[in-house]
Amino acid sequence: MTALSRFPRFFVTSPSPCPYLPGRQERKIFTELSGQQAGELNDALSRIGFRRSQSVAYRPSCAGCTACVSVRVVTEGFQPNATQRKLLKRYGDLEVTACKPWATGEQYELLKRYLDSRHPGGGMAAMDESDYADMVEQSPVSSYVIEYREPSVNGERGRLVGACITDQQGDGLSMIYSYFVTDDEARPGMGNFIIMDHILRARAAGLPYVYLGYWVKGSARMAYKTRYRPIEVLGPTGWALLEDEDMVGAMPSAVAAALA
């Protein structure tokens, strides 16, 4: 077996405008996930801050910036606060199903409404149904679409009010992308509920973590991620509990050196 077949090859994207910090440029390092070891590689890379998108694992590698910090919730210690308990009770009627990674028109229509409401003009705004199918189905790892529906009536499935593309990893669940109704006053806080549902289900399955992707201090779009405690951040010496949000996260030095 050659070295190239044993170890993944990494590539770096060209700089592009940062979607989180105005005036900044982002750059990503990435590798392909393929073959029988794709799941094992994805698990290992997630532990050093990579995320999956279809058959690619990537992480920020921006010149002079380490603002994007990987975060994961420690499921065993999670205790919902009063507001979160009310939300869990409010949505106790929903029917939750872990579906195979097969895109449906109903899912796509919900995604489009979500994007039009929350992220108009964003990078996914022009996504068509074929693009969505690729997003869901081109997964070389253990992946699901977790659907959240209103109660069934007379044998008919209830309305789809939320969904999340989720990977099952060796040490937890990784929430790849969630979307939900945003224009129903009877369903506020749906995104928060989906995160808590993942935390509780992961804990029940004996999985220690729920990976939430990247957190950027000072970004309003990212602020919600630190509501779920205890939460760990990936810093220079590895994963550590986030106790002071003024702390500065950075890529572990060994990883930075290897990817330079």
From Swiss-Prot:
Stretches of the chain forming a coiled coil according to its record: none
GN (gene name): bpt
GO molecular function, one term: leucyl-tRNA--protein transferase activity
Entry keywords, A to Z: Acyltransferase, Cytoplasm, Transferase
Subcellular location(s) per record: Cytoplasm
Species this protein is from: Sphingomonas elodea
Primary subcellular site in the record, as a coarse category: cytoplasm
Protein known as: Aspartate/glutamate leucyltransferase
Catalytic activity annotation: N-terminal L-glutamyl-[protein] + L-leucyl-tRNA(Leu) = N-terminal L-leucyl-L-glutamyl-[protein] + tRNA(Leu) + H(+); N-terminal L-aspartyl-[protein] + L-leucyl-tRNA(Leu) = N-terminal L-leucyl-L-aspartyl-[protein] + tRNA(Leu) + H(+)
Superkingdom assignment: Bacteria
Key word Transferase present: yes
Cellular component GO terms, alphabetical: cytoplasm
BP terms from Gene Ontology: ubiquitin-dependent protein catabolic process via the N-end rule pathway
Family: Belongs to the R-transferase family. Bpt subfamily.
